[in-house]
Amino acid sequence: MVKTQRVVITPGEPAGIGPDLVVQLAQREWPVELVVCADATLLTDRAAMLGLPLTLRPYSPNSPAQPQTTGTLTLLPVALRESVTAGQLAIENGHYVVETLARACDGCLNGEFAALITGPVHKGVINDASIPFTGHTEFFEERSQAKKVVMMLATEELRVALATTHLPLRDIADAITPALLHEVIAILHHDLRTKFGIAEPRILVCGLNPHAGEGGHMGTEEIDTIIPVLDELRAQGMKLNGPLPADTLFQPKYLDNADAVLAMYHDQGLPVLKYQGFGRGVNITLGLPFIRTSVDHGTALELAGRGEADVGSFITALNLAIKMIVNTQ
């Protein structure tokens, strides 16, 4: 890394394990400065509950970034709307969560931060606060005015991107259009090159239907839509293999010769990845004008403040963001 960079972290739902995990991140040195967008009392109280040392340093955007030392975090303060009891949701704090996301996103857009790492949010309490919220991915897409974003989850061994994300099954076939596939594959290919440092990405593409349509006998989306798009993109030089049946694609003879898998919908690709690496996975938003990674788990309200939460996914998300920063320099 040419110079020390700043990354911004949002702990997510304040009543969940996000603050616990951020405090745990502070228990080691990092080659980047960790700027946490959060309420100061929330972090110090949670550190006290966990019995872990924590010193909060004020965020100074005009000072050079410094590597984070053990037991410290840099604080970008955002005030809670209501006091927090670990494990108990408070509707007004839905506004607080969105404020942290907005400030962190804006800081990435204006060049303050080299990457954003997000902790788990509780979508229900945000919506209960009368804030329409589908998820981090859609929020950052809208706020950054990105043309299109792609959700990808990754472990050390496997990367799975999604052509569609949070759609009912009955709507997916209609959503898989040539325009969508062109856009999604272009973003996936571009970010594998620029953010992951893969010169010629090799992408496996799932079919939509069982057995990838069985030659048109179990659906024609492969013949009508997916195959023509893949043929066009191969002619442009992309290394694409598919459409392949999703039930046989996830095995070494295919995965050993690929850099990523493109699944057509959420529950086609993610169960395999989460079974293979749950707790070690990272959610990456491709297509944003900045680097964004996230944990692959939820708020685990029942574990908040108990010292039982596994920080592994957050560490993996932060380490991956650091690697991506290096690749883009």
UniProtKB/Swiss-Prot annotation:
Positions bound to substrate: 136-137, 274, 283, 292
Comment on bound cofactor: Binds 1 divalent metal cation per subunit. Can use ions such as Zn(2+), Mg(2+) or Co(2+).
NCBIfam families linked: pdxA
SUPFAM superfamilies, per database record: Isocitrate/Isopropylmalate dehydrogenase-like
The organism's taxonomic lineage, starting at the top: Bacteria, Pseudomonadati, Pseudomonadota, Gammaproteobacteria, Enterobacterales
Gene3D superfamilies, A to Z: Isopropylmalate Dehydrogenase
GO MF terms, alphabetically ordered: 4-hydroxythreonine-4-phosphate dehydrogenase activity; cobalt ion binding; magnesium ion binding; NAD binding; zinc ion binding
UniProt-annotated location(s): Cytoplasm
EC annotation from Swiss-Prot or TrEMBL: 1.1.1.262
UniProt keywords, alphabetically: Cobalt, Cytoplasm, Magnesium, Metal-binding, NAD, NADP, Oxidoreductase, Pyridoxine biosynthesis, Zinc
Reactions listed under catalytic activity: 4-(phosphooxy)-L-threonine + NAD(+) = 3-amino-2-oxopropyl phosphate + CO2 + NADH
InterPro entries (UniProt xref): PdxA, PdxA_fam
Miscellaneous notes: The active site is located at the dimer interface.
Pathway: Cofactor biosynthesis; pyridoxine 5'-phosphate biosynthesis; pyridoxine 5'-phosphate from D-erythrose 4-phosphate: step 4/5
Main location: cytoplasm
HAMAP family tied to this protein: PdxA
Cofactor(s) named in the record: Zn(2+); Mg(2+); Co(2+)
Name by which UniProt lists this protein: 4-hydroxythreonine-4-phosphate dehydrogenase
Keyword Disulfide bond set for record: no
Function as written in the Swiss-Prot or TrEMBL entry: Catalyzes the NAD(P)-dependent oxidation of 4-(phosphooxy)-L-threonine (HTP) into 2-amino-3-oxo-4-(phosphooxy)butyric acid which spontaneously decarboxylates to form 3-amino-2-oxopropyl phosphate (AHAP).
Subunit-level organization: Homodimer.
Biological process according to GO: pyridoxal phosphate biosynthetic process; pyridoxine biosynthetic process
